[in-house]
Amino acid sequence: WENGHWVEIPAMSIKREYNFDQVGDKDMYLLHHEEIESLAKNIPEAKRIRFFMTFGQSYLDHMRCLEDVGMLSTTPVNFNGQEIVPIQFLKALLPDPASLGPRTKGKTNIGCIFTGKKDGKDKTYYIYNVCDHQECYKEVGSQAISYTTGVPAMCGALMLLTGKWTTKGVHTVEEFDPDPYLDALDKYGLPRSESHNPALVDLSLIHI
């Protein structure tokens, strides 16, 4: 999202390396994610909203190989007299994600970097969480990807049940008071860290 409109680029075409606290240097890719849509709608004064996600080279190599041989296709094909969808067949062959918890190691780092003005002064702020896969498995029997999905949803439900958020209708999280929500995340396993001088992502090579 840039200057009031959507910008489309070829998939996985923009890569940047970033040093993540407790995780280290990782390649991350500019891509679409659904929260950009509600943020652009609810914060119209935002000039730019971007989302990056990290992928290892081995993962990307496997995905490209599967794509090249047609295993990521959603178009049905006939095999031995039966119609199958390649990607659905692939899913049946892959391990259940829930079974990966015991052997998943390392940490996740999920956060947001904001730049703008506050009280007339330029300000940069980085809020993030670091979550350990093995610690999550010890606590709830899942890895950190599931943990960092489930705990925020639980905290959102807690805000509704305790009356912290009372607006009627269908809303997204950025429309509510963030303070009690962030406090709940701190309490229930996703404590925040912050920096007022983070390294910014170099986007100077992107031409729109």
Language-model segments: residues:
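C-terminal catalytic/substrate-binding lobe primarily of soluble NAD(P)-dependent oxidoreductases
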Residues: 1-205
